[in-house]
Amino acid sequence: MGAVSGELTAPSRANPIVFQESLLASSSEQSATLPRHVAIIMDGNGRWARRRLLPRIEGHRQGAKSVRRAIEFCGDTGIKILTLYAFSTENWQRPKSEVSGLMRLLSEFIDSELEELHENDVKLSTIGDLERIPAAMAAKIKAAKSRTADNKSLILNIALSYGGRQDIVRAVKGLATALKSGTVDEDSVTEELFGRYLYTAGLPDPDLLIRTGGELRISNFLLWQAAYTELYFTPVLWPDFSKEDFLRAIEEYRSRQRRFGMTSEQVETDEGVE
C-alpha cells in the first residue's frame, strides 16, 4: 500500500508550463479519480532549518508557506478535505520555547490567512484535544472556526494536540458512557457507530495520506481512519514541498487500484457495473 516517490509521470519543476497543463487536467478530465480527502504528515521542518544553520522555528515558519501552497493546490484541483498534522500529543514533550514558537506561528497564520480562507470558501476545522491549547490560542481558533463555519469548497482540518491512540481511547470512553447510560444498545455497536465518537466524526476517511521528509511511518496519526488509506512517502522536506510534489503524489494515487480487501477481479467487476 505504501510507496516511496520515484519516477512518476508528474511534470518537472523546471517546466512550469507542463505542470500547469497537468494541473488543469487533474481538476477536470481526471476528476473522477481525484482523492476526496488528503491527509498530510508535514515532516522535515527541523532538518530543513538545521541544514541551513537556522533556528528550528525558521523551518516551521517556512513550512507555513507550504501549508498555503497545499491549500491553493486543493482549491485548484477540487480536493474537498485537507487534514494537516500540525501538532501531536507527543509534541508537548518538545522544549517549551519550540512549543511556544509553534503556537505563535499558528496565531500568525490565522491572523494573516483567515480572511482569504473565508473569501475562498474554505472552512477551518480542527481535531484533537484543544483543552491543552493555551486559552487565548484556543479562543482564536474557536473564533476562526465560527467565522468559516458555513464555507463549503474546502475543509481545512488541522490536527492540533492530536494522537491516533488518544483519539481511539477517547472514543471508547464516549461509547462506554453511552452504553452504560442506555442511550446506545450493545447490539447496535458497529464500526460506523464507533466512528461517530472519533474526532473526525462526520468526515470521510482519508483516501490518501502523504508523509514528507523521508520517514516511513505514520506516527500515531489517524490510526483508525487510515485503515484503507493509500500511503505516499516522499523524501522532500515539508518546507520544500511544492505544488509539483503534491501533483506527483496525486498521480501516484491515481495509478493504484484501491481494493478494500477485495481481489483485483472483484474491483474491476464492480467498476464495470458502475
Predicted region positions:
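Flexible, compositionally biased loop and terminal segments
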Residues: 2-274
